[in-house]
Amino acid sequence: MATSKLQALWNHPAGPKTIHFWAPTFKWGISIANIADFQKPPENISYLQQIAVTCTGMIWCRCSTIITPKNWNLFSVNVAMAATGIYQLTRKIKYDYVSEAEAAVEIEG
């Protein structure tokens, strides 16, 4: 039974013999790096980089559900990219705008 499942995976149109398997698998490295950057101070986060990560994730989530064969590895990695990009952008925006607003209130008060 396990052999037949492994053989089915091996021979799948998006299986390990194709770029449709390896491209999203290596793309997980970007999401993992973005998760590792959660510890990075918000002032070091790049708006352009995180916008690119977020947009790429959103665009390819949609495309991964349309293409044949359905590639759930591609879909899941792009959900992770969009989610981590949105989180990093939220951290940066809070740091740049909420922190400045709080500092201005403290100076006025």
Swiss-Prot record:
It is a multi-pass membrane protein. GO terms for biological process: mitochondrial pyruvate transmembrane transport. The keyword Cytoplasm does not apply. It comes from Arabidopsis thaliana. This is Mitochondrial pyruvate carrier 2. Mediates the uptake of pyruvate into mitochondria. The keyword Disulfide bond does not apply. Its main location: mitochondrion. One of its GO terms (cellular component) is mitochondrion. Disulfide bonds: none annotated. Keywords: Membrane, Mitochondrion, Mitochondrion inner membrane, Transmembrane, Transmembrane helix, Transport. Belongs to the mitochondrial pyruvate carrier (MPC) (TC 2.A.105) family. It is found in: Mitochondrion inner membrane. It comes from the Eukaryota. The chain crosses the membrane at residues 19-35, 51-67, 74-90.
